[in-house]
Amino acid sequence: MEMSLRVALFFAFWVCLTTGSLNEICYQEKVVGNCGSQLYPYYFNSQSGKCERFMYTGCGKNDNNFGYLFECERTCPGDLDLGDVCSLEPEGGHCRAYFIKYFFNATSGMCEKFVYGGCGGNV
């Protein structure tokens, strides 16, 4: 019983940390710039809750301007529908990094390791 209580407290704490307010960068409006280039970075659209591509003309950007999708997703993970967090299967994501993470295996009642690729997934 004591182990179950520890696991429950750990997940409650984890959920609070991971679902806190988004980084303030994520609420900045996209800035298309004021030069003549045609670049296609990503920005976090706080209305849709997703990272999206846009045309940036260069010069005059803010911090909500990411060269790569994974940078945007890492900084601004978006709105998560957590549902029952403890019953989620691990999803390693679509990138190729190698981060050891943990998930709660509802069948065994234990936390187990899995490899997270760095973007996407359900961490």
Curated annotation (Swiss-Prot):
<keyword id="KW-0964">Secreted</keyword>
<keyword id="KW-1015">Disulfide bond</keyword>
<dbReference type="GO" id="GO:0044562">
    <property type="term" value="P:envenomation resulting in negative regulation of voltage-gated potassium channel activity in another organism"/>
</dbReference>
<keyword id="KW-0632">Potassium channel impairing toxin</keyword>
<dbReference type="GO" id="GO:0004867">
    <property type="term" value="F:serine-type endopeptidase inhibitor activity"/>
</dbReference>
<dbReference type="Pfam" id="PF00014">
    <property type="entry name" value="Kunitz_BPTI"/>
</dbReference>
<feature type="signal peptide">
    <location>
        <begin position="1"/>
        <end position="20"/>
    </location>
</feature>
<feature type="disulfide bond">
    <location>
        <begin position="86"/>
        <end position="111"/>
    </location>
</feature>
<keyword id="KW-0732">Signal</keyword>
<feature type="disulfide bond">
    <location>
        <begin position="95"/>
        <end position="119"/>
    </location>
</feature>
<keyword id="KW-0800">Toxin</keyword>
<dbReference type="GO" id="GO:0005615">
    <property type="term" value="C:extracellular space"/>
</dbReference>
<feature type="disulfide bond">
    <location>
        <begin position="51"/>
        <end position="72"/>
    </location>
</feature>
<feature type="disulfide bond">
    <location>
        <begin position="35"/>
        <end position="59"/>
    </location>
</feature>
<dbReference type="InterPro" id="IPR050098">
    <property type="entry name" value="TFPI/VKTCI-like"/>
</dbReference>
<feature type="domain" description="BPTI/Kunitz inhibitor 1">
    <location>
        <begin position="26"/>
        <end position="76"/>
    </location>
</feature>
<keyword id="KW-0722">Serine protease inhibitor</keyword>
<feature type="disulfide bond">
    <location>
        <begin position="26"/>
        <end position="76"/>
    </location>
</feature>
<keyword id="KW-1220">Voltage-gated potassium channel impairing toxin</keyword>
<keyword id="KW-0872">Ion channel impairing toxin</keyword>
<feature type="domain" description="BPTI/Kunitz inhibitor 2">
    <location>
        <begin position="86"/>
        <end position="123"/>
    </location>
</feature>
<dbReference type="InterPro" id="IPR002223">
    <property type="entry name" value="Kunitz_BPTI"/>
</dbReference>
<comment type="similarity">
    <text>Belongs to the venom Kunitz-type family. 02 (native) subfamily.</text>
</comment>
<dbReference type="InterPro" id="IPR036880">
    <property type="entry name" value="Kunitz_BPTI_sf"/>
</dbReference>
<keyword id="KW-0646">Protease inhibitor</keyword>
<dbReference type="GO" id="GO:0015459">
    <property type="term" value="F:potassium channel regulator activity"/>
</dbReference>
<protein>
    <recommendedName>
        <fullName>U13-hexatoxin-Hi1a</fullName>
    </recommendedName>
</protein>
<dbReference type="InterPro" id="IPR020901">
    <property type="entry name" value="Prtase_inh_Kunz-CS"/>
</dbReference>
<comment type="function">
    <text>Dual-function toxin that inhibits both serine proteases and voltage-gated potassium channels (Kv).</text>
</comment>
<keyword id="KW-0677">Repeat</keyword>
<dbReference type="GO" id="GO:0090729">
    <property type="term" value="F:toxin activity"/>
</dbReference>
